[in-house]
Amino acid sequence: FPQYTTDYISGVMSLRKPQENSLRILEEIMTSIHVQKGMNLKAALGGVHALYPICSDFERDFMSLTFALATGVGKTRLMGAFISYLYTQHGIKNFFVVAPNTTIYEKLKKDLSDPSNPKYVFKGLGCFHTPPQIVTDDDYKARQISLFESDIRIFIFNIDKFNKEESNMKKINEYIGDSFCEYLANLPDLVLIMDESHHYRAKKGMQAINELHPLLGLELTATPIVNSGSKQVLFKNVVYEYP
């Protein structure tokens, strides 16, 4: 399949303006900065800050960018656009989507994996003629995930399950000969997509997420604010706000 331009993705997916703007911003950052594991985060931050001065800190142990979009803008569709762009333009094949609760987790599973679902986000995109392989927090222990190296994979996890399962995820998995956490941390191209990321900035889950050593983090939230004691602290890694 060809490399899909942001115009092409926006057209096929009928993206709304804020979704399209977000995709273009990701493209500009990915084209300006050589994103790789172990890169100099300070230099990368300087590059992002020069393009989007609102971003002053990645706030994590890896490059993480927040797109602050009002509720109802269609964040799942935007995730699909991010995935399509990173897959076809940058050859990224491993995506780890974190959901803040069971309801959103179930919705993400359907919207990202079920072509018969009217809200299936990859409809019409030739690169997903065969739907991407989905690995969920219900089946990561049993699935022989290492057998699907060639395909694009989307791991979908509920943050609460992630917190509870963390000890299991650190146990050796007979299929992969490593713990699931180690397996993910060793992937060269893991992109973390955090839905409603304001929910789990303070939780220990964030430490667990840092330990996955992703290549890149993309955060989507309508409320880019953390409550710290009686104060409300704004996210420092926002690159786009709508409205």
Predicted regions and their residues:
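Conserved pre-motif I regulatory segment
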Residues: 1-68
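Inter-Walker segment of RecA-like/P-loop motor cores
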Residues: 119-174
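The conserved Walker
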Residues: 71-73
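ASCE P-loop NTPase motor core, strongest for the SF2 helicase catalytic module
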Residues: 31, 58-61, 75, 114, ...
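Conserved Walker A/P-loop ATP-binding site and its immediately adjacent core
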Residues: 91-123
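Short alpha-helical segments and helix-capping/turn motifs at coil-helix boundaries
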Residues: 8-9, 81-83, 134-147, 176-179, ...
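Signature of the SF2 helicase/ATPase Hel1-core->accessory helical subdomain module
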Residues: 84, 88, 102, 109-110, ...
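Motif I (Walker A/P-loop) of helicase-class P-loop NTPases
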Residues: 75-85
